[in-house]
């Protein structure tokens, strides 16, 4: 990722900045904000035995094909579909901007790690980013902030058809309405369960993990108010793209967030301009790997 709250706040900021000619395609906030969580929702989609996870597929496979299929689906004029696609593009932009930094940081921390802490460092970094952006943009602690989306805000029928038609022949055979609805419900319930209204839940889960000598995997997902600012590169130290060390940046998380917002606005506008003009999507814009941030095949 970035994680849940970061994607939500990013999508809210993008909505404020979309030009009116593009903003008119976002008529449904529920679908837009679900789209802002991208393929993360479908890590909880139950595939048939032997089939690869749908969330992983959307992050790593046939990215350009999925966007081209989205473009075709948008021709229906269904506001649920166009709103979801706009949100999905914010997720794409957020991931391709933030993920190279997160993986660069993980590589450095792994090199420096003394071995005393065992857990999901990736999740902890992104959870702390969530807490940081909630404090910065909402002026709340993560204990006070509640993810606003509910299942009743979403038309799953339209989105099911979109996903069924957009994920390729091998995958679409395994996209089923009941499983689709269940994945959306699970995603919302799962993140509500992770919400820690007092700070006590994280302490309890962490303590239980410690007692039974198991990695701090689940507790890493629960937001904390006392986040670790060393994860944010506020001092603007240089870092490299892990998959292309010729790309060197000094961006901290504030600069990355701003870049993700501007890239989201640019890509959403470009997508709907292509829809109106009947032109194909630019490959280099819509074919980047969600984890590396680099053009697939580039």
Q: What are these model-derived regions, one by one?
A:
Residues 1-87, 93-298:
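N-terminal leader/auxiliary helical segments
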